[in-house]
């Protein structure tokens, strides 16, 4: 658990995989885009290393890279990409917001996870990113600033995730979109019975109803 927000340290240059050729990456990327036109090769941050700073926080060293190096892992092409993302646990009146991933997404289709979440973009502060993701995915605003509580590694998708505790007044469930096909607000006992949680959600589960 974090006692202070993580610090991102940007390393100059651009991450390019060494273990595979760019021709292999381009061919795999073209195959993915043919299957799902929603794929977009945007800028991402590659994690070079994560270390504790001795003050209840962590330093995350990052370098700019491209999303295609992450995406092609779905076809078994490991570029060594390790992106950094943000995840939020939204609490509203003693319940937390979860969503079921649609079949159109690249990772965890059909699995339940905490909403919101997304990949951190270069130049964007992590707390601003999680607020943006919440606005995009739930079309709602936060009622208090995000609080960073943990940094996790999602082994299923090889990504580092900064986890935030979020507060919002969720009076009605968000409308579904292309990323999620169902939303729920669940109490602790209900969350325990939810099957098909994503790997990252299972790691976040003990944090969900812990004391803030």
What do the predicted segments below correspond to?
Residues 1-111, 118-132, 140-172, 197, ...:
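N-terminal leader/linker segments that precede catalytic domains of diphosphate-processing enzymes
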Residues 137:
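Short alpha-helical functional segments enriched in proximate histidine and acidic residues
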């Amino acid at each position: 658990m974090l006692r202070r927000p993580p610090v991102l340290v940007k390393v100059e240059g651009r991450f390019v995989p060494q273990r595979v050729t760019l021709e292999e990456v381009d061919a795999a990327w073209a195959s993915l885009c043919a299957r799902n036109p929603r794929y977009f090769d945007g800028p991402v941050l590659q994690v070079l290393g994560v270390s504790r700073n001795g003050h209840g926080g962590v330093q995350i060293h990052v370098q700019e890279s491209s999303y295609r190096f992450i995406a092609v892992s779905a076809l078994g092409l490991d570029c060594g990409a390790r992106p950094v993302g943000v995840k939020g646990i939204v609490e509203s009146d003693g319940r937390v917001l979860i969503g079921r991933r649609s079949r159109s997404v690249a990772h965890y289709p059909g699995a339940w996870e905490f909403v919101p979440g997304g990949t951190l973009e270069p130049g964007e502060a992590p707390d601003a990113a999680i607020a943006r993701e919440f606005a995009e995915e739930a079309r709602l605003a936060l009622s208090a600033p995000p609080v960073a509580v943990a940094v996790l590694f999602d082994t299923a998708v090889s990504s580092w995730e900064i986890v935030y505790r979020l507060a919002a007044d969720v009076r009605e469930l968000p409308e579904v979109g292309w990323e999620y096909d169902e939303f729920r607000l669940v109490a602790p006992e209900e969350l325990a019975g939810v099957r098909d949680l994503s790997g990252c959600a299972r790691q976040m589960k003990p944090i969900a109803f812990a004391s803030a």
